[in-house]
A protein has these predicted regions:
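Chalcogenol-based redox active-site neighborhoods
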Residues: 1-167, 181-183, 189-193
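A short, charged, Gly/Pro-tolerant segment at domain boundaries
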Residues: 169-181
Length: 193
């Protein structure tokens, strides 16, 4: 059995608190023709160096109805900055316009099979998985990326085309699992590409 959601799988529902004081679920994005769910955090340099691109992606695609939501599932016992207070501070500091949600129980990370931060999951209007993996090929070095798989996938879905590259390996820090050492990953998690 695969650890990570497989192409064509339905988006698992969630009910998670956001840094804005609201609780969000899939229903909050029901009007979006495409939904992007990214597993993110506060401490990881791959995330930190991707935040401008996340903000730009949301700015470019929200006007086209694309939903974008970030979920932090990292155990704050590994990195205290990944706790809810750190999330609130980062969101305010960076000016996040998208929901930034806290998955303290890690149940949603397990349901999606999140491997790394950042790890993107793109769902069509029926909330079937059509792309999973990375945003681009160089999340740690802004301006040096040469591929843009997330944008390509979302563009394809908005234009009613098949996603040409539906699966890539996410590039980033591993999800920090409660009760495990900081570099631990489940053995079955090495199944994506």
């Amino acid at each position: 059995m695969a650890f990570t959601l497989q192409l064509g799988d339905s988006a698992p529902d969630f009910s998670l608190p956001g840094v804005d004081g609201r609780t969000y679920s899939l229903a909050d994005f029901s009007g979006s023709p495409v939904l992007v769910v990214v597993f993110s955090c506060v401490h990881c340099p791959y995330v930190v160096n991707s935040e401008e691109r996340m903000l730009q992606f949301d700015a470019d695609y929200s006007s086209r109805g694309v939903g974008f939501v970030a979920i932090n599932s990292n155990a704050e016992t590994t990195y205290a900055d990944d706790g809810f207070e750190g999330m609130v501070a980062r969101s305010a500091e960076r000016g996040f316009n998208f929901p930034f949600l806290h998955d303290q129980s890690q149940e949603i990370a397990l349901a999606y099979g999140a491997l790394r931060t950042p790890h993107y999951f793109v769902f069509d209007g029926e909330r079937k998985l059509r792309y999973t993996g990375r945003m681009d090929d160089n999340p740690r070095n802004p301006g040096k990326e040469t591929t843009h798989e997330l944008r390509d996938a979302v563009d394809a879905l908005l234009e009613n085309r098949e996603v040409e590259v539906p699966l890539t390996n996410p590039i980033g820090c591993n999800v920090k699992w409660s009760g495990q050492e900081k570099h631990w990953m489940p053995a079955e998690a090495c199944d994506i590409v």
